């Protein structure tokens, strides 16, 4: 991108713009590096979007020369090295990071900043949306994420710089200046007394100035989207231990916050089940603890009942997300499979996330994968908290990957 330097010393230019841009880049990188810890932090589950979390961020150091240790010897390779490899690297003193023990080297400057949950999701999920959404009758959902360009303005940020318009403004100023110079030159020729000195030169370079810059004016217009209903089903049986339930709630919490942030008026229903299923409130879903056996069919059957009673597939885009450890009463597997197939028929997307599959017996995931061939069915496996973000990205991609 072209760099426009300030020539007018009297103009008040925002010199902190580059610092803010670099700070935002550091925040984005830090969020991505610490994502697993942020979205799986137990204290944020069920909290409002304004709940703040702390993330570490590296300080920005000025460039400086760093001298070597003047060690003797010459580094050499055997010909198999690639660009970027370090040859003849000596063993350095430890810096005390991680499990290395006490070190004797200077560490990095780290700072902690506070960001809200909404900011974290905004950084990460701006390119994600509910997949496979179709047009239905009586569209009602308003989406906030629909910025539109609306003319130009003199002030703005670099990403919104209108390059063509900026060049046009410069050319207009350049042509006006040339026209004025021709008029002055004609007056000088007509009157010999007003001739320029012999050593006078006219500069041919015509640089950009701050007054030439034009930026796109962006307005956010509410965009009418499509009817959507989200059904969240979670296994709360005894086989779902505290770790599994924690990962399941983390998965649903980030999913729920994404939906509430991205779409207005989306309807969300929460279902929890063991051997029987029931519709619960948001607070009960994220905080209530249950136990008992497992009938997966009970949760899926309850989802079908909710869809039949409230969300006609002819008018609604329905998305069902089910999370379990895959451990099911064997006699219930056939009924659970039938309910899963029925959900694929009435839903735009039926997604199953398996949390730390049980080492005992066969998992329901293998039955679903072998018996369900619908393109709107997707399966993810979550073994640890680092898998949460990858699983959500796979589910919320604009187009499902081919099976």
From Swiss-Prot:
<protein>
    <recommendedName>
        <fullName>UPF0229 protein CKL_0641</fullName>
    </recommendedName>
</protein>
<feature type="compositionally biased region" description="Basic and acidic residues">
    <location>
        <begin position="80"/>
        <end position="97"/>
    </location>
</feature>
<dbReference type="Pfam" id="PF04285">
    <property type="entry name" value="DUF444"/>
</dbReference>
<dbReference type="InterPro" id="IPR014230">
    <property type="entry name" value="Spore_YhbH"/>
</dbReference>
<comment type="similarity">
    <text>Belongs to the UPF0229 family.</text>
</comment>
<feature type="region of interest" description="Disordered">
    <location>
        <begin position="71"/>
        <end position="109"/>
    </location>
</feature>
<dbReference type="InterPro" id="IPR006698">
    <property type="entry name" value="UPF0229"/>
</dbReference>
<dbReference type="InterPro" id="IPR036465">
    <property type="entry name" value="vWFA_dom_sf"/>
</dbReference>
